[in-house]
């Protein structure tokens, strides 16, 4: 855990993570909300310690051919249901990001908020992985594209 993650956790991360953990528990009460609850747990992990993490789609991580059609269809339906709430949360995080960009010291915080807004818009099927894992996944996907 780096210094930025520790500072972020103490100032922003703990409160954000608690909010999204509670939101995850609320969605987990309903059966249809369990995938959203899992995504909110992923987001709580990102909001607690965001530096050194990337948000990528499950199809980018596993490859399009390794994700079932049922999972893709379910993700589209649930992301559509989530969209009104996700749009509000995403815009809120974008506004916070823009406000953070105003100061030079706030630029890393602004980058984090923009990354979070990307996740919140369509959370179903998004995964939080380390930067190294995201790069490795991108390399594997590019190699497989070139072989086809």
Give each language-model segment a name.
Residues 141-148:
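Long, low-complexity, intrinsically disordered cytosolic termini of multi-pass membrane proteins
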Residues 1-44, 68-101, 112:
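Alpha-helical membrane-anchoring segments
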Residues 24-65, 96-141:
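Membrane-interface alpha-helices
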